[in-house]
């Protein structure tokens, strides 16, 4: 018996589309309006700064000769497949987990697009305090982190009790 997509977690795939539109749109604006390395202050402690990331988070393996592009692309595809299957197997009413999965999928697909299209990931958010700068990141990275945090949070929330019928 097949399930209606609306009754599964796939009902939340619109979140993936929203993340992709926002992420790829922001990267397009950076690519069209910034030179590599250019910085524009937004607020105290926050800049827009165009950087290219050839590795993973925190530029992990960025100088590894190019194989990491395909390695991280494969990981992103695998994660997207696994999370999509988990969404299909869960009920649409499991909002927190499904939204978390959708945020991670959207972020992974945004960065995957960059890796495959440009050969690098476009980063632009530069958070700093004084002279200390956090690693430059993008909106896809933010979606992935928020999704992961929601999964952890869900683990700490009390499970709904099922009322027994007499």
Curated annotation (Swiss-Prot):
Regions that span the bilayer: 12-32, 70-90, 102-122, 137-157
GO cellular component: a single term: plasma membrane
InterPro entries: Peptidase_A8
Documented EC number(s): 3.4.23.36
Pathway(s) per entry: Protein modification; lipoprotein biosynthesis (signal peptide cleavage)
Active site, renumbered: 123, 141
Highest taxon of source: Bacteria
Topology class, membrane: Multi-pass membrane protein
Keyword field: Aspartyl protease, Cell inner membrane, Cell membrane, Hydrolase, Membrane, Protease, Transmembrane, Transmembrane helix
Cell compartments where the protein resides: Cell inner membrane
Pfam families in alphabetical order: Peptidase_A8
GO-annotated biological processes: proteolysis
Enzyme's top EC category: hydrolase
GO MF annotation terms: aspartic-type endopeptidase activity
Catalytic activity from the UniProt record: Release of signal peptides from bacterial membrane prolipoproteins. Hydrolyzes -Xaa-Yaa-Zaa-|-(S,diacylglyceryl)Cys-, in which Xaa is hydrophobic (preferably Leu), and Yaa (Ala or Ser) and Zaa (Gly or Ala) have small, neutral side chains
Protein family: Belongs to the peptidase A8 family.
NCBIfam families noted in UniProt: lspA
Record function comment: This protein specifically catalyzes the removal of signal peptides from prolipoproteins.
PANTHER family hit by this protein: LIPOPROTEIN SIGNAL PEPTIDASE
Protein name: Lipoprotein signal peptidase
Organism name: Klebsiella pneumoniae subsp. pneumoniae (strain ATCC 700721 / MGH 78578)
Gene behind the chain: lspA
């Amino acid at each position: 018996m097949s399930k209606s997509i609306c009754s599964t977690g796939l009902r939340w795939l619109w979140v993936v589309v929203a993340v992709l539109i926002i992420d790829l749109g922001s990267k397009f604006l950076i690519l069209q309006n910034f030179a590599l390395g250019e910085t524009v202050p937004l607020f105290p402690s926050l800049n827009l700064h165009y950087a290219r990331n050839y590795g993973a988070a925190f530029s992990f393996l960025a100088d590894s000769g190019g194989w990491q592009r395909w390695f991280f692309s494969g990981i992103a595809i695998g994660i997207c497949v696994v999370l999509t299957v988990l969404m299909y197997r869960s009920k649409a009413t499991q909002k927190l987990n499904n939204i978390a999965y959708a945020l991670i999928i959207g972020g992974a697909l945004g960065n995957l697009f960059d890796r495959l299209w440009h050969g690098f990931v476009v980063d632009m958010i530069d958070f700093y305090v004084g002279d200390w700068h956090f690693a430059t990141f993008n909106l896809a990275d933010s979606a992935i982190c928020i999704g992961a945090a929601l999964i952890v949070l869900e683990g700490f929330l009390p499970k709904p009790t099922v009322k027994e019928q007499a």
